[in-house]
Structure formats: C-alpha cells, structure tokens
Amino acid sequence: MAQLAKFDVPEELTNKALEALELARDTGKIKKGTNEATKAIERGNAKLVLIAEDIEPAEIVAHIGPLSEEKKAPYIFIKNQKELGAASGLGVSCATVAIVDAGKAAEMVQDIAQKLEALK
C-alpha cells in the first residue's frame, strides 16, 4: 500500500474530524466521493477534506493532498474508508469527503484545521 499521509494524525483528532463530518452532514453540506471532493477543493469551497488511507490503488486519491495544499484547504487522513463512508451517511465505503458548509460543526472544523496546521 502506498503511503499517502505526509504527517501523523493523532487518533483523537481523527475521531473529532469524523464527529465534525457527521454534524456537518446533518446541519450543513458535504461532498461525497473523490470527484465531488476534488471539485469542491478546486472551487475553494472545501472547509475540511477527509481522505481514507486504505484506498487501493492509492492513485485514486493521490492528487487530493497536493491540491488541498495548493488551494489552502485543510485535509486529514482517516485510517478506514468504511468509517469515512459511515460518517458520511453512506452504506458503503468512501474514499474522500469534503465539508463544504460545516453548519453547526463550524467551530469544530476551525479547531481541527488549526490543529492540522500545527502538525504539518
């Protein structure tokens, strides 16, 4: 498996990101799937991008990290694509999700973004 993550994310922060995703899903707006997330990042709409680490082949999501950095969108790696899919409200696994409107999770997303910046 290719190593996608450029930095280690504490499990506590990963769990907080999944919690923020669930809240944003219910009170805001999210984009599910690599194509939708890519469009949100390119348009500058992504507040937080969640990328599954266990994607095969890794090339499917390899562009997300560099694109997020270019567009100044915070991104975090989630260990398991099934967890990401479940938090997105999908019954299947998901490679990438972008939070476009955080809704009631706005403060959480901002806090996560600041902590991610400190990790890099």
Curated annotation (Swiss-Prot):
Record has tRNA processing as a keyword: yes
Subcellular location: Cytoplasm
GO cellular-component term (any): ribosome
InterPro entries (UniProt xref): Ribosomal_eL30-like_sf (IPR029064), Ribosomal_eL8-like_CS (IPR004037), Ribosomal_eL8/eL30/eS12/Gad45 (IPR004038), Ribosomal_eL8/Nhp2 (IPR018492), Ribosomal_eL8_arc (IPR022481)
GO terms, biological process: ribosome biogenesis; translation; tRNA 5'-leader removal
MF annotations from Gene Ontology: ribonuclease P activity; rRNA binding; structural constituent of ribosome
Keyword Iron belongs to the record: no
Keywords in alphabetical order: Cytoplasm, Ribonucleoprotein, Ribosomal protein, RNA-binding, rRNA-binding, tRNA processing
Main location: cytoplasm
Known partners and oligomeric status: Part of the 50S ribosomal subunit. Probably part of the RNase P complex.
Protein purpose: Multifunctional RNA-binding protein that recognizes the K-turn motif in ribosomal RNA, the RNA component of RNase P, box H/ACA, box C/D and box C'/D' sRNAs.
Family, similarity comment: Belongs to the eukaryotic ribosomal protein eL8 family.
Cross-referenced NCBIfam families: eL8_ribo
This protein's name: Large ribosomal subunit protein eL8
Organism annotation: Methanosarcina acetivorans (strain ATCC 35395 / DSM 2834 / JCM 12185 / C2A)
